[in-house]
Amino acid sequence: AKKRSRSRKRSASRKRSRSRKRSASKKSSKKHVRKALAAGMKNHLLAHPKGSNNFILAKKKAPRRRRRVAKKVKKAPPKARRRVRVAKSRRSRTARSRRRR
């Protein structure tokens, strides 16, 4: 029997499924983000709409709107695998630059 391709269109009810959301949020955890960075996947990490330091691992074919790469990730150190904290909240950085002025 021919294996069915994975690119099958997902039904609306499947898209709303909790397990899918849960697996997505799991992948946005810092541990996953660090692992992905270490694997050189920084272009697949998108800024998460909700959290300051959550990222979503996105597929290359994600719609352009969702494909915006998180700014904080771009500057991630090459030693991301060993670093514990990768993402600092954006707010603290802007506050720091304001203080400097």
From Swiss-Prot:
The keyword Magnesium does not apply. Sperm. Residues 1-101 are annotated as: Disordered. Keywords: Chromosome, DNA-binding, Nucleus, Repeat. Signal peptide: none annotated. The keyword Nucleus applies. One of its GO terms (cellular component) is nucleus. One of its GO terms (molecular function) is DNA binding. Residues 32-65 are annotated as: Globular. Residues 1-35, 58-101 have a biased composition (Basic residues). This is Histone H1-like protein EM6.
